[in-house]
């Protein structure tokens, strides 16, 4: 019998990644025995592995996160190459966030949202309440000063949130989650980048057929040509992959 409450770990470039078989496995793992896990979720793709390689502070942030999972198809392929028996699939961060919100709405789990433009955040809250009856106990847009951080952490703690999602981009969101956990440790934190923009329709995500083919990165590149310099960096990751330097 398959144990959905457990998941193997696979190491890439010295970072242990959770090997989820699919979205159902991910949710059952995070809500094992009816208890939501506590810690930090970090989506790992090739670009994030490259950044971790070059930036010791980012690497330390990622290494400290309890739940690092394969968000990028290239990372999934590298795991399968290094560990041929691995039963691991891509769990896209945007999809995991939506599934987590749907589950939270079903179970009444208190949620605090951080990040995004004020209007996008307001639309995200409204849609979450309408679509899944999510119990949103507080929110804060991404426009706050460093001096306001401690007040934000105090608000999150006072809210009793069990899920805190932060849309500020990497590594800002990882830094904020790390610091907030010192004040409010008993929650599941998730960095979600631009997910609120996608969820509310302000940014168009790749069609499902592109996602299923593992070409979401190419769709984003064609839609946003300025990303080309970021994609060129990935040649280094391809060298790691094809030379087995994983």
From Swiss-Prot:
UniProt cross-references to InterPro entries, sorted A to Z: UDP-ManNAcA_Trfase_WecG, WecG_TagA_CpsF
Species annotation: Salmonella agona (strain SL483)
Entry's Gene Ontology BP terms: enterobacterial common antigen biosynthetic process
Function: Catalyzes the synthesis of Und-PP-GlcNAc-ManNAcA (Lipid II), the second lipid-linked intermediate involved in enterobacterial common antigen (ECA) synthesis.
Higher taxonomy: Bacteria, Pseudomonadati, Pseudomonadota, Gammaproteobacteria, Enterobacterales
Keywords annotated in UniProt: Glycosyltransferase, Transferase
Superkingdom field: Bacteria
GO function terms (MF aspect): lipopolysaccharide N-acetylmannosaminouronosyltransferase activity
Record pathway: Bacterial outer membrane biogenesis; enterobacterial common antigen biosynthesis
Pfam families assigned: Glyco_tran_WecG (PF03808)
Family as reported in the entry's similarity comment: Belongs to the glycosyltransferase 26 family.
E.C. code: 2.4.1.180
Top enzyme class: transferase
Reaction catalysed by this enzyme: UDP-N-acetyl-alpha-D-mannosaminouronate + N-acetyl-alpha-D-glucosaminyl-di-trans,octa-cis-undecaprenyl diphosphate = beta-D-ManNAcA-(1->4)-alpha-D-GlcNAc-di-trans,octa-cis-undecaprenyl diphosphate + UDP + H(+)
Protein name: UDP-N-acetyl-D-mannosaminuronic acid transferase
């Amino acid at each position: 019998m398959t144990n959905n409450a457990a998941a193997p770990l696979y190491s890439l470039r010295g970072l242990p990644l959770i090997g989820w078989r699919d979205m159902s496995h991910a949710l059952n793992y995070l809500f094992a025995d009816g208890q939501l896990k506590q810690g930090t979720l970090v989506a790992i793709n090739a670009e994030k592995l490259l950044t971790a390689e070059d930036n010791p502070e980012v690497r330390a942030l990622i290494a400290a996160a309890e739940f690092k999972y394969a968000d990028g198809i290239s990372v999934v392929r590298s795991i399968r190459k290094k560990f041929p028996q691995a039963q691991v699939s891509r769990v896209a961060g945007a999809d995991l966030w939506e599934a987590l919100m749907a589950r939270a709405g079903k179970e009444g789990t208190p949620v605090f949202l951080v990040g995004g433009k004020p209007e996008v955040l307001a639309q995200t809250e409204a849609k979450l309440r309408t679509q899944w009856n999510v119990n949103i106990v507080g929110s804060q847009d991404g426009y706050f000063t460093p001096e306001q951080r401690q007040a934000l952490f105090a608000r999150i703690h006072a809210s009793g949130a069990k899920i805190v999602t932060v849309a500020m981009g990497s590594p800002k969101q990882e830094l904020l989650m790390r610091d907030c956990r010192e004040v409010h440790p008993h929650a599941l934190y998730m960095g979600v980048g631009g997910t609120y923009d996608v969820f509310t329709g302000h940014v168009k995500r790749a069609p499902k057929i592109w996602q299923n083919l593992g070409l979401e990165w190419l769709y984003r590149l064609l839609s946003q040509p300025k990303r080309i310099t970021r994609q060129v960096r990935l040649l280094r990751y391809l060298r790691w992959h094809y030379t087995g330097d994983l």
